[in-house]
Curated annotation (Swiss-Prot):
This is tRNA-aminoacylation cofactor ARC1. Binds to tRNA and functions as a cofactor for the methionyl-tRNA synthetase (MetRS) and glutamyl-tRNA synthetase (GluRS). Forms a complex with MetRS and GluRS and increases their affinity for cognate tRNAs due to the presence of a tRNA binding domain in its middle and C-terminal part. Binds specifically G4 quadruplex nucleic acid structures (these are four-stranded right-handed helices, stabilized by guanine base quartets). Also required for cytoplasmic confinement of the synthetases and tRNA. One of its GO terms (cellular component) is methionyl glutamyl tRNA synthetase complex. It is found in: Cytoplasm. Present with 57700 molecules/cell in log phase SD medium. Residues 133-206 are annotated as: Disordered. Residues 52-61, 91-121 are annotated as: Interaction with glutamyl-tRNA synthetase GUS1. Residues 146-180 have a biased composition (Basic and acidic residues).
Length: 376
């Protein structure tokens, strides 16, 4: 067993439960076969393509032993390619996704400075253009056949009509029909627009957001972004912990990010943050001077449901639609009261203008010292 594999197996991140799908198992077997053949260099383009669409090789949220085995062979190859290249920028452009992955893995595994690939993060690479597949005509062959029949029918009808210029009476009738159709269409459009304007938009409810207690198992600094931490957080998913990028470097030392309970927003759309896909967000309270974690009550467990009072029985959305701006509409109502409890404050709600963030036991969630905080 190599030193890198041994080092990986000593990390907490290697102990996460892994349950591969059939597709992921096939991917792992494919790369194992490539490694056994000793011919990984011809597969570098394929590896770069895989890492373009995934953070790690087997489409997981965190590295697996497959990443370590492939990394061990790919690192010296890429080092040689970069060192011998007459056009380093071109090499970086060609293998940009492998380089991002190598940078993360070598920092995770604490590769020695002699073996480490020194990556130029200031190199200005051209924008990557990804070709989109052309959509096939809807309906395929059936539509093509129907169109052919329609063309034949039109041709036959055309031949049935006598050739030559229509008389004036016919032209007048056609003009009147066209005018009437245009007026009817305009009236229908105006009616539809008026109905849409009169229809009040449905107000999103805070129950749409999937708040959960999370446990940060491990956090490291993002290899490509000085302001970001990359945390592995257990939020109770059967698939295992999530990878979460947080811009908290300026506010918390790395030690404060280890093995602690937090509140996590779990249904925002995943976002790529400097090459690493972030699949959730840590909830914090802040003012102009400082940032503080929203602290779960004592004896909380990873995966515990968190909600605002009155919405405990409602299920959150699977994923918030960014186009509908649900988070942007609700978040400004999140704040803290004088007792430092996180609340949802909406003065338009006459019956319940204030709702506390709570759990199934009715306990409060607080920040350490900031009243009237922005919570996000």
């Amino acid at each position: 067993m190599s030193d890198l594999v041994t080092k990986f197996e000593s990390l907490i991140i290697s102990k996460y439960p892994v349950s591969f799908t059939k597709e992921q198992s096939a991917q792992a077997a494919q790369w194992e076969s490539v490694l056994k053949s000793g011919q990984i260099q011809p597969h570098l383009d394929q590896l770069n393509l895989v890492l373009r669409d995934n953070t790690f090789i087997v489409s997981t949220l965190y590295p697996t032993s497959t990443d370590v085995h492939v990394f061990e062979v790919a690192l010296p190859l890429i080092k040689d390619l970069v060192a011998s290249s007459k056009d380093v920028k071109s090499t970086y452009t060609t293998y940009r996704h492998i380089l991002r992955w190598i940078d993360y893995m070598q920092n995770l595994l604490e590769v020695s400075s002699t073996d480490k690939l020194e990556i130029n993060h200031d190199l200005d690479l051209p924008h990557e253009v990804i070709e989109k597949k052309k959509k096939a005509p809807a309906g395929g062959a059936a539509d093509a056949a129907a169109k052919a029949d329609e063309d034949v029918s039109k041709k036959a009808k055309k031949q049935d009509h006598p050739r030559g210029k229509p008389d004036e009476e016919t032209l007048k009738k056609l003009r009147e029909e066209a005018k009437a159709k245009k007026a009817a269409k305009k009236a229908a459009n105006a009616k539809q627009q008026q109905e849409q304007q009169n229809k009040a938009p449905e107000k999103p409810k805070p129950s749409a957001i999937d708040f959960r207690v999370g446990f940060i198992q491990k956090a490291i600094k993002h290899p490509d972004a000085d302001s970001l931490y990359v945390s592995t957080i257990d939020v109770g998913d059967e698939e295992g912990p999530r990878t979460v990028c947080s811009g908290l470097v300026k506010h918390f030392p790395l030690d404060a990010m280890q093995e602690r309970y937090v509140v996590v927003v779990c249904n925002l759309k995943p976002v790529n943050m400097r090459g690493i896909k972030s699949t959730a967000m840590v909830l914090c309270g802040s003012n102009d001077d400082k940032v503080e974690f929203v602290e779960p009550p004592k004896d909380s467990k990873a995966g515990d449901k968190v909600f605002f009072e009155g919405f405990g029985d409602e299920a959150p959305m699977k994923q918030l639609n960014p186009k509908k701006k649900i988070w942007e509409h609700l978040q400004p109502h999140f704040t803290t009261n004088d007792g430092l409890e996180v609340i949802f404050k909406d003065e338009e709600e006459k019956d319940h203008p204030v709702r506390k963030l709570t759990n199934a036991k009715g306990e409060s969630f607080k920040v350490a010292s900031i009243a009237n905080a922005q919570v996000r």
